[in-house]
Amino acid sequence: MLKKILSLFKKEEPKTEEKPTEVEEKKEEREEKEEKKVRELTPQELELFKRAMGITPHNYWQWASRTNNFKLLTDGEWVWVEGYEEHIGKQLPLNQARAWSWEFIKNRLKELNL
C-alpha cells in the first residue's frame, strides 16, 4: 500500500514547452552580440565619433574620464564604452549614455553639417 502511494507522488507530469524567461532572452541576445565581430574603433571612426559628440580639446578630459579614455568598441551597428554593454539599445540622456548607434552618430553629423 505504501509503495502504491509513493508511486502516485513520483509520477512525473508531462512537461510542457516553457517560454524563455526574460533573463534567458537577455542572455541569448548577449550571446548573439558576442558572436558579432567586436573591435575597437579605427582612427577615422574615432574622429567621426568625436565630431558628432562635439568633443574638442577644451572638453576632451571630461569625455575621456567618462569613457575610460575612449576605449570604444563597435560591432558595426553600435559604439559603446568597454564595460557598458548593458547600455546598448537603451535611450539615455546624452550626458549619461555610454552606447550610441551609428545611425545616431550619422544624424548628429548631419545636424551639425559636418
Swiss-Prot record:
- Xref: Pfam families: Aq_1974-like
Basic and acidic residues biased stretches: 9-37
Q: Which InterPro entries match?
A: Aq_1974-like
**Which superkingdom does the taxonomy of this entry point to?**
Bacteria
Q: Which organism is it from?
A: Aquifex aeolicus (strain VF5)
Task: Write down what this protein is called.
Answer: Uncharacterized protein aq_1974
Stretches the record annotates as Disordered: 1-37
